[in-house]
Amino acid sequence: TAALRLRRGGARVTLVTKGVGGLQLGQGTVDVLGYTPGRVEKPYEAVKELASKHPEHPYAKIGVEAVREGIDFLREVTGDSYLLGDGETTINLPTAVGAIRPTALVPPSMIKGNLKDGDKVIVIGLAQYKDFHAGLIAQNIDRATLPGGGHASARAVVVDFEPREGEYDATGLSIARSLDNARTRRALAEGLKGFVNPGEIVALPAVLGIDNHSEVLADFTKILGAEVFEIASLPPCVPGMRLNNKLVVTAKNERVDYVLGSKVTGCKVTDGKVVSVTVGTVGAAKEIKADAVVLAGGGFESGALKLDSHGHLHETILDLPVTMPEGVKEEDLVHGDYWGSPQPLFQCGVEVDENMLVTYQGKPVHSNVYAAGGVIAGATRWQEKSGEGVALGSAIKAADAILSSVGAGAATRERN
């Protein structure tokens, strides 16, 4: 998001990433704020309230308008064929275990999973796809009280489907690739038709194509004569791959320089400003000059933040100072009540100002280093369901601040 925002603003952009990123591990949905700790029904309103009550939270610096702008920008980039929703109202979807989780934007293939009282669902599993447990999902949907009140009923059916002859332990991606083939998907849909009762909504694992997804969804809907939705399974998740592929292709088409599989190993600082970063490429290290840097490496899960064996915290890419929750010592970052109160460790990260410029104790660390996403301190993203909202809002603020200060200069976004 930061790279595309900068590129469309006229900057020359290099995107450096050690790996393919976490999007394809996700469900292809976009969270803004799901819990505070109670379930949220109006995400933007909840962001405002959270920001006013918790000044240490990233949303207090980002602000709801930047989050809204980030959501709108992402939808502009991807279009309605990838994401539906407006962030104003929560969309509630069944998970891979049948629990109902809140989110803000969803792929069109999932929107019918926003169940209401009285809905009847048939969950169809594929015997060769062992990461999708249709019976468990149906049982939990059947007994759940829906967020809007009432209940849906659900039952499960499991059928045989070999994406390739003799493939008895298939992945979601191999099934999705096989369903990109029109003959294969139509044969499967015809075979499922007899299981579906009139009025039932059909829930399938999120494997309805990777490159020809819209056509796959349309064929299943037409042949089954029913509303169809995907339920995300265990990562890596096909809807996340679709969204990741769309953004990468868009960035390349818009002439963002994309450096994949290379780690940033250091930077050169002159007069308090990072003037270049060093990237470990095959053969020799490469120096990339930069007028501004956006650090978007994620948190502990991606390796951008690290707690070493001595209990010391590190930011591993640019060696920026890491802040902890107020009043917490390093030895208390992880407590023994694992199923109780939040672990302070996950609120650690880099400190930023309202422009997402990285600071420490209120002063800029470098005059041109900004942060976006999970590396920013103050949010327990997985528990709040705030990850994408924080990432999008901070990316918008960082990119716009850079464009205001350096205009069409080169900006390097780094991920580790």
Language-model features: locations:
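Conserved beta-strand-loop-beta-strand element in the redox core of flavoprotein oxidoreductases
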Residues: 248, 267-287, 293
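Conserved N-terminal glycine-rich FAD pyrophosphate-binding loop of Rossmann-like flavoproteins
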Residues: 18-55, 163-177
